[in-house]
């Protein structure tokens, strides 16, 4: 192969590599942002579940509140 052809191919590979490095960095930033957002959402969900449990009375009566069964 000619030197100019090799130089052209090398330049093309370097260009592709640079583009891929930028893409990988962008994807890494996106994944990191999503992980942070998911952690926040998990915490919000945990707090909502706690509030829901605290505000909703149980529909199951305790044993002391239950009427005794009829005797046959």
From Swiss-Prot:
Pfam families: SlyX
Coiled-coil residues: none
Record InterPro entries: SlyX
Recorded family membership: Belongs to the SlyX family.
Protein name from the UniProt record: Protein SlyX
Source species taxonomy: Bacteria, Pseudomonadati, Pseudomonadota, Gammaproteobacteria, Enterobacterales
Gene: slyX
